[in-house]
Amino acid sequence: MSQGSKPTSSDIAINQRVGATVEGFRVVSTRLRSAEYESFSHQARLLGLSDSMAIRVAVRRIGGFLEIDAETRHKMEAILLSIGTLSSNIAALLSAYAENPTMDLEALRAERIAFGESFADLDGLLRSILSVSRRRIDGCSMLKDSL
């Protein structure tokens, strides 16, 4: 294109392609259903964000696909510690039984019940983390809190 002349459509297309590849950035695209896009876009507009900026904020904020809050992480660590302790207790009961084959059924029953309760707690916590609808609500809250 010479100086002073109008740009042609091919000149504009070339300039757009060159401008779109900024060093240090990667373009990420996603396909959303119409309802998903409308909901996402509406929420972004309510916060004064473009779709692109809302996605950027969300990606920076989540830092992972299953980001969990500190309280949930502590609960999970406590449950895992409890399961480890219960496992040790059961191993001790089995060892005691090997030395003296008279079984303390009440102790074994108590450990088995506690073990089941810990697994139920872990199952409930994992279900809440993996719940898609809850994660969507949490994602909206996280986006608002990030601003």
From Swiss-Prot:
One MF term in the entry's GO annotations: endonuclease activity
Enzyme class: hydrolase
Record keyword Transmembrane helix present: no
Function in brief: Tumor formation by A.tumefaciens involves the transfer and integration of a defined segment (T-DNA) of Ti plasmid DNA into the plant nuclear genome. The virD operon encodes a site-specific endonuclease that cleaves at a unique site within both 24 bp direct repeats flanking the T-DNA.
The protein's name in its UniProt record: T-DNA border endonuclease VirD1
Keywords: Crown gall tumor, Endonuclease, Hydrolase, Nuclease, Plasmid
EC number: 3.1.-.-
One Pfam family cited in the UniProt record for this chain: VirD1
